[in-house]
Amino acid sequence: MEISNILVVDDELSVIKALTRSFLDDPYKVYSAISATEGLSILEKVEIKVVISDEGMPGMSGADFLAKVKVRFPAVVRIMLTGHASLDAAIKAINRGEIYRFFTKPWDDFELRFAVRSAVEKYDLEEENRRLLDIVKKQALNMKLLAKEFPGITQLEYDEKGRIIIQDVPDAEIARIVAELDLEYSA
């Protein structure tokens, strides 16, 4: 099973330790930061999939930190922890689309672990979608190039039963086209 990197940002060391303990049995490498600035520094160096941030931190609030994460690292899934006193800030962050989930302190370990697992899956699915979209874009470009070089090649003909009619193309011509496409995909 692949190990996923998650980042915990809280100015209270006891909270960081408790969160880290929560994920001991999960396939995560937990990075920690005691400030938003330190968290941003870690994000610059490590591919993080999920950030869990406290809302009430000195220097930069969790909402402001997660807003910066959204802009600089849009693929990272963001979760906020908050005390009841800072619930308004959490709601504003949710409404601005900066966080995936939020939890109040004290949190339920099971629910938090489930949310992080879902967040990692969300990250992985979105990354796979981006990868597949890149492939589709390359294939569309190749189709345009083929259509330019071989007019009509991308148009299909159907028989009366709806089956595609395949024209006879010499094997040498097919081999040449495949070789050209292989060169473009390997580039």
Where do the model's predicted regions map?
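Two-component/phosphorelay signaling modules centered on CheY-like receiver
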Residues: S4, L13-S32
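C-terminal output helix
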Residues: W107-V116, V120, D124
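Active-site beta3 strand of CheY-like receiver
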Residues: V46-I52
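C-terminal output/effector regions of signal-responsive regulators
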Residues: R131-A187
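Helix N-cap/capping motif at the beta->alpha junctions
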Residues: S32-S41, G62
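Short amphipathic alpha-helix used as the core "switch/output" element in two-component signaling
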Residues: S41, A63-A75
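The feature encodes the CheY-like receiver
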Residues: I16, P58-G59, T82
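Active-site residues of response regulator receiver
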Residues: D10, D54, T82
